[in-house]
Amino acid sequence: MKINTWFGSLEVGSGGEILAFDLFPKGIRELALRSLSLRSSRENLPPEGFDLKAAALECGFVASLSEYYSLLHEVTLEAAKLQVSEAITPDQRIVQAVEALDDINETTNSLSERLFEWYGGYFPESGLVGEALALFIVKYGSRENVPPDDPLYLKARDSMGAKLETADEALLKGFAESVCSLYSRRKQLEAYIESSMEALAPNLTTIAGPMLGARLISIAGSLEKLAAFPSSTIQVIGANKALFKHLRARAPSPKHGVIYSHPFINTSPWWVRGKVARALAAKISLAARIDFYSATKDLSLMGELEEKVRKIRAANPKPPQKR
Amino acid sequence: MKINTWFGSLEVGSGGEILAFDLFPKGIRELALRSLSLRSSRENLPPEGFDLKAAALECGFVASLSEYYSLLHEVTLEAAKLQVSEAITPDQRIVQAVEALDDINETTNSLSERLFEWYGGYFPESGLVGEALALFIVKYGSRENVPPDDPLYLKARDSMGAKLETADEALLKGFAESVCSLYSRRKQLEAYIESSMEALAPNLTTIAGPMLGARLISIAGSLEKLAAFPSSTIQVIGANKALFKHLRARAPSPKHGVIYSHPFINTSPWWVRGKVARALAAKISLAARIDFYSATKDLSLMGELEEKVRKIRAANPKPPQKR
Amino acid sequence: MPDIKLLSEGIFEIMKDKRQLATLNLDPGKVVYGEKLISVEGAEYRTWDPRRSKLGAMVLKKFNIPLSKDSKVLYLGAASGTTVSHVSDIASEGAVYSVEFASRSMRDFIRLASRRKNIFPILADAGKPDSYAHIVEPVDLIFQDVAQPNQAEIAARNAARFLNKNGYLLLSIKARSIDTAASPKEIFKEEVKKLEQAFEPGFEILTARDLMPYHEDHLGVLAKLKE
Amino acid sequence: MPDIKLLSEGIFEIMKDKRQLATLNLDPGKVVYGEKLISVEGAEYRTWDPRRSKLGAMVLKKFNIPLSKDSKVLYLGAASGTTVSHVSDIASEGAVYSVEFASRSMRDFIRLASRRKNIFPILADAGKPDSYAHIVEPVDLIFQDVAQPNQAEIAARNAARFLNKNGYLLLSIKARSIDTAASPKEIFKEEVKKLEQAFEPGFEILTARDLMPYHEDHLGVLAKLKE
């Protein structure tokens, strides 16, 4: 019986005695690569309870147990490092970008609110929020610098806001610059996710849109896992809390998770949203599977979904009567 | 009897009849300023139940009730705006900076962690964190760009990290730039708080340090409120949760709030920290009062506190015996 | 078409999807704090969330609300104007003198006040009524929601100076702002006693009810001056 | 000088300020996950937090821990190595084959493994023992903490291939990872039954105790192969 080990191929007799062997060269990297290549082999496995280290000694692969362990330590370490270096697949890169985008969104909102509150003491009438406010502050600082041709000139001139001292103006401008930097980061991440999604999962991107598609992959963990989910799971991805409550306390089953943000659902009247969500989840599941297994674009998917949603809406023109 | 109203001074008889009057000019801003100047007058108040609008009609200040209300509306609005524009006092500006700094710290930490996690997939051996990591990524991007004269060259060359694609490198560099922007914002805010505190509250700054002093003002709401607190309150400022628990559920009284960060406390052995906190809080309270009421620097304060702390430590060289 | 019921002068209950408290919008088309606008036969109603307004909660707790379209009101503790806006809707031809101490809140309140002619903003300490005695006329109602430990005293001082003989006091007492440790029930008993006896002029309590479930540990009080 | 008590081979209880579980540090001066180092007469101990380690909790719940200094161990679910580091301390002259499926955890685990000669990292699915059959020798103990719904099956498969006739299985079962809805008690009963009967080879259960108060809804199990 032939068996494969990390240090070589052996021919073993029925009593476990070694009849012949073909040892690998002792290079760490080479041994690690061979070891990795053996991972998925279903044949020539050592029999249950086979003592690898005794065999390695017997064949003369190593001169001592301590050499055996020392070499195996280096080889397993190298193999693990090689695997780790290959772990960042295209869908994992999208997942990283989605997570980074979530962090950026959260911090941008929090710093934008602070800027609004802070600058509001100096020019509460500006009516500006978010990036527009940050850009305004970077440009002018104090409202005294707003020129007559700016649409906000009159409001700035007549503002009840306090006078902005030079030191505070520098502080606010710097703060606004950081906020602007975060807004451009947001755009950069969104653009990356859009183009990566189109390349990785064209069908999912068509059906769900790039951002929702990326979010689904991110919550599932990978495109492979998303493709493996039943569509009933996809329907409630991101509704963990509600789902947990449903399972534990027999609360009503949630109708939709993150797919709620899809325009087909949030533009539908409330009484058909559950049905639309079910149809959408089914199509997303199909799209993810095509993307994972064949990666070719199926041009008919979107038309089918639109038709299905149209039918659902047509069949349910009115809200159900309350009982 | 002479009485002051927002529209003029009146001479009123004992039956409430108007004997004479001196009306103000009808300019909105001028009336608003006069109205504000009457706020703190303790004399010549209208008697209880005095009907101002009837008097204004009677004196001919206005021709109709609707004119009365319309004018009063404009005047109260203008007065309130004037007050709001003066509300941002030097200590309020420090409070704003402290709040902005808190937000910046929180977001910087969260984005730094994300950067560490994300870049860790490409160069886990760098050993860099925080601003050093962000600066490294801005400088080099991929570890392939680390030159042989950089101390991290060997680690970069032999890293188990994945290969960093160009598109991801641009993303990571941009993200790192935003993080760097936040770190410089943090420094700018700290420098502002330090110099403002030295000017506003030199004694508090000497005793507590500028950052702790600013935080105490921020939690109290203003220097005036801080100066009005008893020192037992100052000792536990920022320990709200523990204090609330103490009041509600008879839990032990908290020994110190934010003043815990003071070097006199956190370098003291644990068994004298309560005593040191009490001494420190007393001196902080005194310093805040001097700053609020006289704003002159008292050079003896720090020496007295140091002496007091020295004595506390000398009197309690050993931990109390457990019973 | 939604079903509309009149609860008190200027205060409505509209049935649209669910029962909603509402007032007629004095500033048509404009929303103050994110509430909904509902148009019925040319009239525009603004919904009124009792969880965000002590007065709104008092309406639903069946307090008699002594407000009519020409009421003169002294409102103590205007904050950013959520409730004042509804009082302004109701007393559409009256006057709402609105006192608020925090300049940060006043900044927002000014935006509201500048759009409504019957609101008169006053940035002042409600505990010092002398400081606005040169502005405020005698009123029919004092509404007070100031979250100060000495709120009974504040009510008495303002009533002495500004409240008409037949006028009313509507008061919201927050247990926490009196004492964080004692039980709300004890606090309420104590505060009601203070209103009745501790200061000149004393009040006669007409109604006193907690504002559950809209506000926890809050007592609503309707009172008038002792004769 | 701290008081030291031997609880099991290589496992100590040190009294310093409070009782603390500890092992002798195989990598002196280095800390793995923020634990404390305590030096006593030239020997360096690493404290071991039972709240962060199922095995640590099992020690305190008085499980017999079948580990000695030359043990060969197959550790399934190495994560980032918190517990493996202590197993490596105890089996200082043995071998700890450490299987972990998540490459993110393996990234951190490699840092630990590279400093300790007796750790052999394996990035693989513990449910597929064939994939590391060419590496792992027969072992004296399988420790398993994988939080998979089919953990009984995983234990059986690995035991069949790698566990010595006289070897032991130490298993931590997390109720939530089997079923989020059922009661932990029911789940534990079911899982113990599966270990005994559902797969070849069956196990004989020696000890089964929950890991409270260190870990909620976790069952620790010590078992050996049926004869």
From Swiss-Prot, chains C, D:
Gene3D superfamilies: Phosphorylase Kinase, domain 1, Vaccinia Virus protein VP39
EC number: 2.1.1.-
SUPFAM superfamilies, per database record: S-adenosyl-L-methionine-dependent methyltransferases
Disulfide bond recorded as keyword: no
Residues where S-adenosyl-L-methionine binds: T82, T83, E100, F101, D125, A126, D145, V146, A147, Q148
NCBIfam families, A to Z: PRK04266.1-2, PRK04266.1-4
Protein name (record): Fibrillarin-like rRNA/tRNA 2'-O-methyltransferase
Species, as recorded: Methanosarcina acetivorans (strain ATCC 35395 / DSM 2834 / JCM 12185 / C2A)
